[in-house]
From Swiss-Prot:
Cofactor: Mn(2+)
Presence of the UniProt keyword Magnesium in the record: no
Residues recorded with modification N6-succinyllysine: 68, 75, 122, 130
EC number(s) from the headed UniProt entry: 1.15.1.1
Organism: Pongo pygmaeus (Bornean orangutan)
GO molecular function, one term: superoxide dismutase activity
The protein's name: Superoxide dismutase [Mn], mitochondrial
């Protein structure tokens, strides 16, 4: 099972992807709200398919791939280990990303963050509105499928915006610790917003769980 810790998320798969001798299988996390709770901004059909089909597929495929990887390790088959890396990255990243995404959303979300997170956003982006514009632009600008992210650069102590293709996990790709992720795969919005990704990006700000994002930020500052 993927840990629900809020800091260093991508490192939580390290035991499973490295030493597999006593690994536990990953499982699909429960949503902290009903499928229809984010309406009208994200409808119930999208949420049901996104969680119970798409995320579940990443979990199942990750478990299968890890079993194959364990067999390759036991056999000392380096070629097979290398060949399995893309599937580990894709399905492991999909599991990490979606496990963060669900907690980043809330039917009681929207508005602005408070306290230290808001001050950090103002410091690093000028204002909350400028931050929204930059993260929206980065997310809309993803070519094909991927994610827009607000991450924390622990070395610099600053917030940064980044975009990752496909299911590449933010921390494993950039070193940034994920705080807020926006899924811009078509399965996240197409049934409701068709091919108009900007409309989906406009709507999702109404359900951002700033309490969760703040918890992640405060944990990573320690």
């Amino acid at each position: 099972m993927l840990s629900r810790g809020v800091c260093g998320t991508s490192r939580q798969l390290a035991p499973a992807l490295g030493y597999l001798g006593s690994r536990q299988k990953h499982s699909l996390p429960d949503l902290p709200y009903d499928y229809g709770a984010l309406e009208p901004h994200i409808n119930a059909q999208i949420m049901q398919l996104h969680h119970s089909k798409h995320h579940a597929a990443y979990v199942n495929n990750l478990n299968v791939t890890e079993e194959k990887y364990q067999e390759a390790l036991a056999k000392g088959d380096v070629t097979a280990q290398i060949a399995l890396q893309p599937a580990l990255k894709f399905n492991g990243g999909g599991h990490i990303n979606h496990s963060i995404f669900w907690t980043n959303l809330s039917p009681n979300g929207g508005g602005e963050p408070k306290g230290e997170l808001l001050e950090a956003i103002k410091r690093d982006f000028g204002s909350f509105d400028k931050f929204k514009e930059k993260l929206t632009a980065a997310s809309v600008g993803v070519q094909g499928s991927g994610w827009g992210w607000l991450g924390f650069n622990k070395e610099r102590g600053h917030l940064q915006i980044a975009a990752c293709p496909n299911q590449d996990p933010l921390q494993g790709t950039t070193g940034l610790i994920p705080l807020l992720g926006i899924d811009v795969w078509e399965h996240a919005y197409y049934l409701q917003y068709k091919n108009v990704r900007p409309d989906y990006l406009k709507a999702i700000w109404n359900v951002i769980n700033w309490e969760n994002v703040t918890e992640r930020y405060m944990a990573c500052k320690k």
